[in-house]
């Protein structure tokens, strides 16, 4: 991996912010709402990073597409309701050291930043507002307008928007979906161990880091 890269692309859930409690609560509400057994916390968090329909299909593969869609809408409604009820600061907090990493990269005029997330546009905008990240990212790619990870569509769009070549860019994420997406698009890949997938699932990463200091 080069010593200096032009574009740094971040996953959001599990990489920048810890929203695990919020995700599990919203998922429990969605499944209870249609009378289905709630999946385990481990199963739910293992699928974080996929688009909602893909995640629901992974959690209940025996259910039809219509149920996956209903679950996805139920999750969105529960997520918004919890956000409105508890306030912004309760739903997605920065992992320790992330603010410093983002501020450090932003201060470097050479470096561009982007996001590639399985979140919706509304969800990402909420986090950007919550953490006052307006102007940090040159491009933000979300699940609303792309195939689910690990399809490389989001990274292709980020490269196109910034005019950066794949060999000059890195994807930073906490799941195997992020690593596979990066490799499919020709980007370097850094896996972080504080998120949702165990280190053995990050084997495709060029580097694995355990702390934001290492990052």
Task: Describe the role of every protein-language-model region.
Residues 30-31, 51-66, 127, 158-159:
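Helix-loop "lid/cap" segments that line or gate small-molecule binding pockets
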Residues 1-8, 121-215:
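Asp-based, Mg2+/Mn2+-dependent phosphohydrolase catalytic module
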Residues 15, 27, 98-129:
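Substrate-recognition element of Asp-dependent hydrolases with the DxDx(T/V) motif
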Residues 58-103, 108-110:
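Metal-dependent phosphoesterase signature
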Residues 32-37, 63-66, 108-109, 131-136, ...:
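Short helix-capping segments at alpha-helix termini
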Residues 1-46, 60:
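Active-site neighborhood of HAD-like aspartate-dependent phosphohydrolases
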Residues 47, 51, 93-97, 119, ...:
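Short beta->alpha linker loops
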